[in-house]
UniProtKB/Swiss-Prot annotation:
<protein>
    <recommendedName>
        <fullName>Cytochrome b</fullName>
    </recommendedName>
</protein>
<comment type="similarity">
    <text>Belongs to the cytochrome b family.</text>
</comment>
<feature type="binding site" description="axial binding residue">
    <location>
        <position position="182"/>
    </location>
    <ligand>
        <name>heme b b562</name>
    </ligand>
</feature>
<feature type="transmembrane region" description="Helical">
    <location>
        <begin position="288"/>
        <end position="308"/>
    </location>
</feature>
<keyword id="KW-0830">Ubiquinone</keyword>
<feature type="binding site">
    <location>
        <position position="201"/>
    </location>
    <ligand>
        <name>a ubiquinone</name>
    </ligand>
</feature>
<dbReference type="InterPro" id="IPR036150">
    <property type="entry name" value="Cyt_b/b6_C_sf"/>
</dbReference>
<feature type="binding site" description="axial binding residue">
    <location>
        <position position="83"/>
    </location>
    <ligand>
        <name>heme b b562</name>
    </ligand>
</feature>
<keyword id="KW-0408">Iron</keyword>
<dbReference type="Pfam" id="PF00033">
    <property type="entry name" value="Cytochrome_B"/>
</dbReference>
<keyword id="KW-0812">Transmembrane</keyword>
<dbReference type="InterPro" id="IPR048259">
    <property type="entry name" value="Cytochrome_b_N_euk/bac"/>
</dbReference>
<feature type="binding site" description="axial binding residue">
    <location>
        <position position="97"/>
    </location>
    <ligand>
        <name>heme b b566</name>
    </ligand>
</feature>
<feature type="transmembrane region" description="Helical">
    <location>
        <begin position="113"/>
        <end position="133"/>
    </location>
</feature>
<keyword id="KW-0496">Mitochondrion</keyword>
<feature type="transmembrane region" description="Helical">
    <location>
        <begin position="77"/>
        <end position="98"/>
    </location>
</feature>
<dbReference type="InterPro" id="IPR027387">
    <property type="entry name" value="Cytb/b6-like_sf"/>
</dbReference>
Amino acid sequence: MTNIRKTHPLMKILNKTFIDLPTPSNISSWWNFGSLLGLCLTVQILTGLFLAMHYTPDTSTAFSSITHICRDVNYGWMIRHLHANGASMFFICLYIHIGRGLYYGSYLFKKTWNIGVLLLFTTMATAFMGYVLPWGQMSFWGATVITNLLSAIPYIGTTLVEWVWGGFSVDKATLTRFFALHFILPFIIVALTTVHLLFLHETGSNNPMGIPSNMDKIPFHPYHTIKDILGALLLMFVLLTLTLLAPDLLGDPDNYTPANPLNTPAHIKPEWYFLFAYAILRSIPNKLGGVLALLFSILILLFIPLLHTSKQRSMMFRPLSQLLFWLLMTDLLVLTWIGGQPVEHPYIIMGQLASILYFLLILVMMPTASFIENKILKW
């Protein structure tokens, strides 16, 4: 008798995706982060669902509804902090996943890569809107500052901002629509993830050496399922440790003060995972220029397949490119640190230099290094 998992219409799809999927035998732990992102998304949707059962998207009661969740709901404090810190874990996994794609040349699967960039944008939008919901000081002012960037768009800017706000300032209408969008977007992310996997399984996974591995494939289960379970346990350990021992470590103390339109916080800054982009935005004195730089700092990922000049796919055997890659990672860490600092000397000039270096590395230095490596290898 044929196994049901190979004949049943639904089981057959799952079987081809997670059980009998031919996988390269040499993929390292850097390939674990895709499944970890799936786990993060599941945790976020489940905790978010329970939070939505008790939350009220109204300016007069939003802040107190969060207090009610933390004080009166059974394990509400835990659900709330799992959701907040789960977002941080999500972005850590996301950035490592993108970094691995850059290092090993996975971006040459163009369809998969482009859907991935779209997923990044959607996740960033979801996280931003989620940060507004507690209606604390940083929620309100973060929403005001970031949505106000749309006013830099010539001619239609002001109209667009008022359309997004649903009025003449960030108010009840803004909070209600942000809650609606924050609720629906994760399900759109699930749909996009399915498409992401669909495109990936058209080509099969890349591997650390960046060479075809068709002659050396192993089934996904049990070899990679057990490996993914270990990764999942480690991720949950870190998330639970963070949630139970230092729940507010990555948050902003200002968000424990209810939103007050008459009192501006000393330093308006987004969550830590947006600080690198925020630093790039702030480093340009012109408003429109800053917005374009902010947008391009993420959109640049779409151009990476076009900037690939090396004859080798992976950076595994390219020391010059490796050096520039780690310089880029360091630069992003510097930008993240700068984004959290006040706008004063020496942070302004450091942010400007780090921003210039970021674009230079991706657009000029890395393609040039690849070209030089080709010449050295007489290719």
